């Protein structure tokens, strides 16, 4: 379970980015955090990951194996390491896998799943496309076998086909391996395909919280209706 109780956070004392956030996520529930840029979505993810400490309130995670997938993959990779080195480091650090043959077999399996060419493994992060690097970014997190996965705008660098491929892979992972799956996005269509619950943030506060089946209910918050209408065009 993930639980946030009365969490408030600000980068300085004068302005709070998040205010009195209360969220409970039971095991097995996939949650989307929806809102415009600047509403506090990424800050919320950073708090759950333990990168920041709340000014007020408490955050409880029942599982320590939490990993992120961020929007900009280039900053997530060591620029001086090949893609292969970065992927194998995840296998060693998180799973204790030191056998090179076993590492290679896992990489080959995942390359096929993500529809990526093995020749790209010898490249540096700067030598592959943004879409390819983002798929490697997702692959690296899944190779580590986290119990909780937090994805922050992960489809922003992907074309339509690659986006659907990654979504299908993540959906399969939520069935087999993940306790929790949290997706941070401003794209409602992505959330509709990945999660069963949506929490809406506006100006650092939760204004709506509902299951995906309740998305079009008449009692949705006006801001939620505004977002839904914007994505319907």
UniProtKB/Swiss-Prot annotation:
Alphabetical list of SUPFAM superfamilies matching this protein: P-loop containing nucleoside triphosphate hydrolases (SSF52540)
CDD domains on file: ABC_NikE_OppD_transporters
Top-rank taxon, per record: Bacteria
Membrane protein topology class: Peripheral membrane protein
Residues forming coiled coils: none
EC number: 7.2.2.11
Primary localization class, coarse: membrane
Assembly notes: The complex is composed of two ATP-binding proteins (NikD and NikE), two transmembrane proteins (NikB and NikC) and a solute-binding protein (NikA).
Function per UniProt: Part of the ABC transporter complex NikABCDE (Opp2) involved in nickel import. Probably responsible for energy coupling to the transport system.
Family designation: Belongs to the ABC transporter superfamily.
PANTHER family: TRANSPORT ATP-BINDING PROTEIN
Record-given protein name: Nickel import system ATP-binding protein NikE
Native source species: Staphylococcus aureus (strain MRSA252)
Gene name of this polypeptide: nikE
